[in-house]
Protein backbone atom coordinates (compact mmCIF):
# COMPACT_ATOMS: atom_id res chain seq x y z
CA UNK A 1 0.00 0.00 0.00
CA UNK A 2 1.13 3.53 -0.69
CA UNK A 3 0.75 6.37 1.85
CA UNK A 4 -1.09 9.56 0.98
CA UNK A 5 1.26 12.55 0.87
CA UNK A 6 -0.10 16.10 0.90
CA UNK A 7 1.23 16.71 -2.64
CA UNK A 8 -0.51 13.59 -3.99
CA UNK A 9 -3.68 14.63 -2.21
CA UNK A 10 -3.59 17.99 -4.04
CA UNK A 11 -3.30 16.09 -7.33
CA UNK A 12 -6.23 13.90 -6.26
CA UNK A 13 -8.37 16.93 -5.52
CA UNK A 14 -7.55 18.57 -8.83
CA UNK A 15 -8.42 15.42 -10.77
CA UNK A 16 -11.65 14.88 -8.84
CA UNK A 17 -12.68 18.51 -9.38
CA UNK A 18 -12.33 18.17 -13.13
CA UNK A 19 -14.36 14.98 -13.13
CA UNK A 20 -17.12 16.33 -10.95
CA UNK A 21 -17.46 19.30 -13.26
CA UNK A 22 -18.66 16.82 -15.87
CA UNK A 23 -15.84 17.32 -18.35
CA UNK A 24 -15.95 14.55 -20.94
CA UNK A 25 -13.18 12.03 -20.60
CA UNK A 26 -12.78 8.34 -21.11
CA UNK A 27 -12.46 7.94 -17.37
CA UNK A 28 -15.50 9.63 -15.91
CA UNK A 29 -16.21 7.73 -12.71
CA UNK A 30 -14.88 8.63 -9.29
CA UNK A 31 -12.48 5.73 -8.81
CA UNK A 32 -11.14 5.15 -12.30
CA UNK A 33 -9.67 8.61 -12.86
CA UNK A 34 -5.91 8.16 -13.12
CA UNK A 35 -5.41 11.23 -10.94
CA UNK A 36 -6.93 9.30 -8.05
CA UNK A 37 -4.52 6.39 -8.12
CA UNK A 38 -1.46 8.29 -6.89
CA UNK A 39 -1.38 8.89 -3.17
CA UNK A 40 -4.41 6.92 -2.00
CA UNK A 41 -4.09 3.71 -0.06
CA UNK A 42 -5.52 0.70 -1.87
CA UNK A 43 -8.46 -1.25 -0.54
CA UNK A 44 -9.98 -4.50 -1.77
CA UNK A 45 -13.67 -4.87 -2.64
CA UNK A 46 -15.17 -8.36 -2.90
CA UNK A 47 -18.56 -10.03 -3.09
CA UNK A 48 -19.75 -13.62 -2.91
CA UNK A 49 -21.97 -12.93 -5.96
CA UNK A 50 -19.80 -10.58 -8.06
CA UNK A 51 -16.43 -11.19 -9.71
CA UNK A 52 -14.09 -8.72 -11.39
CA UNK A 53 -15.01 -8.29 -15.06
CA UNK A 54 -17.81 -10.87 -14.88
CA UNK A 55 -21.59 -10.47 -15.42
CA UNK A 56 -23.78 -9.34 -12.54
CA UNK A 57 -26.40 -11.99 -11.72
CA UNK A 58 -29.86 -10.83 -12.91
CA UNK A 59 -31.19 -10.90 -9.33
CA UNK A 60 -29.25 -7.68 -8.63
CA UNK A 61 -30.47 -5.88 -11.76
CA UNK A 62 -33.62 -4.13 -12.95
CA UNK A 63 -34.43 -7.37 -14.81
CA UNK A 64 -34.52 -9.35 -11.56
CA UNK A 65 -35.30 -8.52 -7.92
CA UNK A 66 -33.35 -5.23 -8.11
CA UNK A 67 -31.74 -5.80 -4.70
CA UNK A 68 -28.31 -4.54 -3.70
CA UNK A 69 -25.64 -7.25 -3.77
CA UNK A 70 -23.65 -8.26 -0.70
CA UNK A 71 -20.29 -6.46 -0.58
CA UNK A 72 -17.16 -6.66 1.58
CA UNK A 73 -14.09 -4.45 1.70
CA UNK A 74 -10.76 -4.41 3.46
CA UNK A 75 -10.30 -2.03 6.35
CA UNK A 76 -8.99 1.43 5.56
CA UNK A 77 -5.65 2.73 6.82
CA UNK A 78 -5.04 4.17 10.26
CA UNK A 79 -6.92 7.45 10.54
CA UNK A 80 -10.03 6.23 8.73
CA UNK A 81 -13.14 7.69 10.34
CA UNK A 82 -15.83 6.36 7.97
CA UNK A 83 -16.53 4.86 4.55
CA UNK A 84 -18.45 5.86 1.43
CA UNK A 85 -19.81 3.32 -1.07
CA UNK A 86 -20.61 4.37 -4.63
CA UNK A 87 -21.98 2.25 -7.49
CA UNK A 88 -21.80 3.84 -10.94
CA UNK A 89 -22.46 2.83 -14.54
CA UNK A 90 -19.31 3.97 -16.34
CA UNK A 91 -20.89 3.41 -19.77
CA UNK A 92 -24.03 5.47 -19.30
CA UNK A 93 -25.23 7.72 -22.10
CA UNK A 94 -25.02 10.68 -19.73
CA UNK A 95 -22.17 13.19 -19.53
CA UNK A 96 -21.22 11.64 -16.20
CA UNK A 97 -21.68 8.04 -15.05
CA UNK A 98 -25.16 7.06 -13.92
CA UNK A 99 -25.18 6.85 -10.11
CA UNK A 100 -26.85 3.61 -9.04
CA UNK A 101 -26.14 3.78 -5.31
CA UNK A 102 -24.47 6.09 -2.80
CA UNK A 103 -24.07 5.13 0.85
CA UNK A 104 -22.15 7.36 3.22
CA UNK A 105 -21.33 7.76 6.90
CA UNK A 106 -20.61 4.02 7.12
CA UNK A 107 -18.90 3.54 10.52
CA UNK A 108 -15.20 2.73 10.58
CA UNK A 109 -15.89 -0.72 12.08
CA UNK A 110 -18.08 -1.67 9.12
CA UNK A 111 -16.48 -3.64 6.32
CA UNK A 112 -19.44 -5.33 4.67
CA UNK A 113 -23.06 -4.88 3.66
CA UNK A 114 -25.43 -7.84 3.32
CA UNK A 115 -27.65 -8.52 0.34
CA UNK A 116 -30.52 -6.02 0.05
CA UNK A 117 -28.91 -3.68 2.60
CA UNK A 118 -30.36 -0.73 0.66
CA UNK A 119 -33.88 -1.74 1.71
CA UNK A 120 -33.20 -2.00 5.46
CA UNK A 121 -33.63 1.69 6.23
CA UNK A 122 -30.44 1.53 8.33
CA UNK A 123 -28.18 3.27 5.81
CA UNK A 124 -27.66 6.91 4.91
CA UNK A 125 -28.14 6.91 1.16
CA UNK A 126 -27.76 9.55 -1.51
CA UNK A 127 -29.80 10.19 -4.63
CA UNK A 128 -29.35 7.76 -7.50
CA UNK A 129 -29.80 8.76 -11.14
CA UNK A 130 -33.56 8.16 -10.82
CA UNK A 131 -33.80 10.65 -7.95
CA UNK A 132 -34.35 7.97 -5.29
CA UNK A 133 -32.36 7.43 -2.09
CA UNK A 134 -31.72 3.73 -2.62
CA UNK A 135 -30.04 1.16 -4.84
CA UNK A 136 -31.23 0.76 -8.40
CA UNK A 137 -29.86 -2.16 -10.35
CA UNK A 138 -28.21 -2.19 -13.75
CA UNK A 139 -30.56 -1.50 -16.65
CA UNK A 140 -28.61 -0.81 -19.85
CA UNK A 141 -30.29 -0.55 -23.23
CA UNK A 142 -30.79 -3.86 -25.04
CA UNK A 143 -27.69 -5.09 -26.81
CA UNK A 144 -25.31 -3.03 -24.67
CA UNK A 145 -22.77 -4.24 -22.13
CA UNK A 146 -22.13 -1.75 -19.33
CA UNK A 147 -19.44 -1.73 -16.64
CA UNK A 148 -20.57 -1.11 -13.07
CA UNK A 149 -17.99 0.21 -10.61
CA UNK A 150 -18.60 -0.84 -6.98
CA UNK A 151 -16.31 1.62 -5.18
CA UNK A 152 -15.39 2.07 -1.54
CA UNK A 153 -13.66 5.16 -0.17
CA UNK A 154 -12.11 5.55 3.29
CA UNK A 155 -12.32 9.08 4.67
CA UNK A 156 -10.25 10.69 7.40
CA UNK A 157 -13.13 12.93 8.47
CA UNK A 158 -16.86 12.56 8.97
CA UNK A 159 -19.38 13.58 6.35
CA UNK A 160 -22.18 15.75 7.67
CA UNK A 161 -24.46 15.44 4.64
CA UNK A 162 -28.08 14.48 5.34
CA UNK A 163 -29.79 11.61 3.49
CA UNK A 164 -30.47 12.38 -0.16
CA UNK A 165 -27.15 14.01 -1.01
CA UNK A 166 -26.36 14.50 -4.69
CA UNK A 167 -23.31 13.31 -6.59
CA UNK A 168 -21.67 16.79 -6.53
CA UNK A 169 -22.29 17.16 -2.79
CA UNK A 170 -20.77 13.78 -2.03
CA UNK A 171 -17.93 14.49 -4.45
CA UNK A 172 -16.98 17.58 -2.46
CA UNK A 173 -16.85 15.50 0.72
CA UNK A 174 -14.62 12.93 -1.01
CA UNK A 175 -12.28 15.68 -2.22
CA UNK A 176 -11.83 16.86 1.36
CA UNK A 177 -11.32 13.53 3.06
CA UNK A 178 -10.61 10.49 0.83
CA UNK A 179 -7.48 8.65 1.96
CA UNK A 180 -8.07 5.20 0.44
CA UNK A 181 -10.13 3.59 -2.28
CA UNK A 182 -10.99 0.25 -3.78
CA UNK A 183 -13.27 -1.02 -6.49
CA UNK A 184 -14.74 -4.07 -8.12
CA UNK A 185 -15.97 -3.75 -11.70
CA UNK A 186 -18.69 -6.10 -12.96
CA UNK A 187 -20.72 -6.04 -16.17
CA UNK A 188 -24.30 -6.41 -17.27
CA UNK A 189 -25.72 -7.00 -20.75
CA UNK A 190 -29.31 -7.02 -21.91
Regions found by a protein language model. Give the residues of each.
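Bacterial N-terminal signal peptides that target proteins for export
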Residues: 2-12
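N-terminus-centered regions that define maturation/targeting leaders and the start
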Residues: 23-190
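Intrinsically disordered, low-complexity segments enriched in Ser/Pro/Gly/Ala and basic residues
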Residues: 3-4, 16, 24-26
Amino acid sequence: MMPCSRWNRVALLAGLSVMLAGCGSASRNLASNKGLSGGLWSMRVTSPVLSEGQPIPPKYTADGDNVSPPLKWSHGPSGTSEYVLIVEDADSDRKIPAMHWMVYRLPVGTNELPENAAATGNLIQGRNYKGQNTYTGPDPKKGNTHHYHFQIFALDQSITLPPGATRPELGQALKRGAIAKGKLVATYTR
